[in-house]
Design a protein with these regions (language model features):
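Non-catalytic nucleic-acid-binding/docking modules located in mid-to-C-terminal regions
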Residues: 2-3, 9, 17, 21-23, ...
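Noncatalytic, basic helical substrate-engagement surface that gates or grips nucleic-acid strands
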Residues: 2-6, 17-157, 161-184, 188-189, ...
Length: 306
């Protein structure tokens, strides 16, 4: 880990920013997040998206590799890994059958494109990491904490706001947020780096409060309702005053009117939503971080795909 300095008044150690800035950088990529953005960038601008002359879909491969190379060029990482979801039900879906049940069906030509992409990544010797029963976000959270424990800085590439809960610049973790990885037609719009200030400007809360924020107001994109009747503005107001969900419920007597009633009725919903939103840092993954060091490509794997 980067060095810390200790102040003379025995206050907590302060991270040494100069040491952190020279620490090796690991880029962690939310594979499905970038893949879907790549797919829809071209599907919307071209009827049927990109294809080879023989009809093989290539929107995902083209857009993903294009963005990957641009991130590598701009960030110059020492190591990289990409996490993908798996087809198996996750522990969240087992706990709640309605979790992500609002998602539209995956386009038919997306899956073969993903398969070809993962073969391309294998040829580039970039680790593709999955964990059945867990989401890619959980894999990324676990990898990020393993990486900082081994002295890396970490930048997570994703368009999923759930990953904002990982942001901790004092530990060396930021998110390269794909608010618009592509413009219409595939023109590149680069990711924006999110630290504490950016997350707070976007959501109104700090990264450490993201889980409790979503526990209160829910997350429609994942079909998580949160506490009925508590919207984003109320969630932000409560967290600014009480800091955490637990503190809010410990202070119900000081909360008046309809908000108090909604919180009382929705306590179990808040706890359930928090369980669904919280990323796991103990995801079982079978990889040594040394395997994430950048390596040369494997021509024998790449040739049949090009």
């Amino acid at each position: 880990m980067p060095r810390s300095t200790t102040t003379s008044d025995n206050s907590p150690p302060v991270p040494d920013d100069s040491a952190m800035a020279t620490s090796p950088l690991m880029i962690l990529i939310d594979g499905h997040s970038l893949a879907f953005r790549s797919y829809f960038a071209f599907a919307k601008s071209r009827q049927g998206g990109l294809r080879t002359k023989t009809g093989i879909p290539t929107s995902v491969c083209f857009g993903f590799i294009k963005s990957l190379l641009e991130v590598m060029e701009s960030e110059n990482p020492n190591a990289i890994a990409i996490a993908f979801d798996t087809k198996e039900a996750t522990f969240r879906q087992q706990a709640d059958a309605t979790y992500k049940a609002n998602r539209t069906e995956t386009p038919e030509d997306f899956l073969p494109d993903i398969k070809n992409l993962q073969q391309l990544l294998e040829g580039l010797r970039i680790p593709v990491i999955t964990s059945p029963g867990y989401e890619a976000d959980d894999v990324l959270a676990t990898l990020a904490h393993q990486a900082i424990d081994q002295g890396y800085r970490v930048k997570v590439v994703s368009g999923d706001r759930d990953l904002f809960q990982l942001v901790a610049p004092d530990k060396g973790i930021t998110v390269l947020y794909l608010s618009g990885a592509f413009a219409r037609g595939g023109a590149t719009v680069g990711p924006t780096e999110y630290g504490l200030e950016e997350v707070e400007a976007k959501l109104g809360v700090l990264p450490s409060q993201v889980v409790d924020y979503k526990a209160l107001c829910g997350d429609p994109s994942d079909n998580i309702p949160g506490v009925k009747g508590i919207g984003a503005k109320t969630a932000v107001k409560l967290l600014k005053e009480y800091q955490t969900l637990d503190n809010i419920y410990a202070s119900l007597d000081s909360i008046k009117g309809a908000v108090k009633k909604k919180l009382e009725v929705g306590k179990l919903d808040a706890e359930h939503a928090r369980y669904l939103v919280q990323l796991r840092f103990d995801t079982p993954i079978d990889i040594d971080l040394d395997q994430c060091q950048l390596q040369g490509f494997d021509p024998q794997v790449l040739k049949p795909l090009l």
